[in-house]
């Protein structure tokens, strides 16, 4: 890789990382807006992970990404002391704890939707009167229902009330947001498997044992997992959820860079072993 191509590659890579940091703010703004409807009595400490699962998840994933970038690209093997290596492992372990916790936040959102019940005695939204009702536009988006806009949300005749909330949605909308919640859960679960494999890859590469059958199984598994993640991104794109679509593709690019780092790291180790063997044979 020439110097110019090297600079362009790194500029593109760190631009992707910076955009992912921006997404932390975008998801927080989305979660904050939804929390005013989801938690009408205020967000209690126990509600934080459910109400802000996206923002917490994205923030910790960015930290985890930077940890992998440090070990696989920025820090040279010769300059990584045992203390630095242990520190990176501990930081990543803490990130994994929070990521698993966030996964249960996505699961809680899905289970919450299962509690939606038919709103009896209501055949159109305008009949709800002047009470503080909101329409569930998306998984994390609510719109206040007023006399001026009540007829614009849905022409359905059957509506569902979300458990414990003055928020309603029609049958088609409930199906859509439930499917989106399923995709969130599947996406989060698959990413957990991806990062588990990547952690194993890094640990084996540290010991120069990332080769043979283990290497082939890792590559095959990640091919399947990344394909599922790509399908999730496409689904969000089809459903018009731009932020999730955009975020999903950025993460695929970001971890493609980490995979390239691991490949180059392995190649450097092989070249070093070959050079050492050649020197010893002279």
Show the residue positions of the predicted features.
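Central hydrophobic cores of alpha-helical transmembrane segments in multi-pass inner-membrane proteins
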Residues: 58-74
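Juxtamembrane membrane-water interface segments of multi-pass membrane proteins
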Residues: 2, 70-86, 111, 198-214, ...
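Membrane-helix interface and helix-disruption motif detector
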Residues: 45-56, 111-114, 178-186, 236-247
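Transmembrane alpha-helical segments of multi-pass membrane proteins
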Residues: 13, 83-99, 213-229
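C-terminal transmembrane-bundle signature of multipass membrane proteins
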Residues: 17-25, 190-207, 223-278
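N-terminal membrane topogenic signal
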Residues: 1-15
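Membrane-interface segments at the starts/ends of alpha-helical transmembrane spans
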Residues: 39-53, 127-137, 154-183
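Membrane-helix interface motif
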Residues: 24-39, 107-122, 151-165
């Amino acid at each position: 890789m020439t110097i110019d191509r090297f600079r362009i590659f790194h500029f593109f890579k760190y631009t992707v990382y910076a955009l992912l940091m921006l997404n932390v703010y975008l998801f927080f703004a989305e979660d904050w807006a939804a929390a005013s409807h989801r938690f009408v009595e205020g967000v209690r400490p126990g509600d934080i992970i459910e109400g802000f699962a996206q923002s917490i998840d994205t923030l910790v994933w960015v930290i985890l990404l930077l940890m992998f970038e440090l070990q696989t690209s920025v820090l040279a093997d010769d300059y990584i002391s045992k203390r630095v290596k242990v520190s990176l492992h501990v930081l990543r372990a803490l990130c994994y704890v929070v990521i698993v916790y966030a996964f249960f936040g996505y699961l809680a959102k899905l289970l919450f939707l299962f509690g939606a019940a038919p709103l009896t005695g209501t055949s159109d939204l305008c009949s709800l009167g002047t009470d503080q009702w909101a329409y569930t536009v998306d998984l994390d988006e609510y719109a206040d229902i007023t006399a001026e806009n009540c007829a614009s949300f849905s022409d359905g005749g059957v509506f569902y009330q979300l458990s414990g909330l003055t928020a309603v949605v029609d049958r088609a909308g409930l199906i859509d947001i439930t499917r989106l919640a399923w995709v969130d859960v599947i996406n989060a679960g698959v990413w957990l498997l991806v990062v588990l494999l990547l952690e194993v890859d890094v640990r084996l590469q540290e010991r120069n044992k990332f080769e043979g059958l283990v290497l082939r199984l890792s590559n095959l598994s990640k091919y399947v997992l990344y394909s599922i993640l790509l399908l999730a991104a496409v689904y969000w794109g089809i459903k018009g959820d731009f932020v999730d679509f955009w975020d999903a593709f950025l993460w695929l690019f970001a971890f493609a860079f980490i995979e390239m780092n691991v490949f180059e790291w392995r190649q450097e180790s092989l070249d070093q072993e070959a050079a050492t063997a050649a020197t010893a044979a002279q």
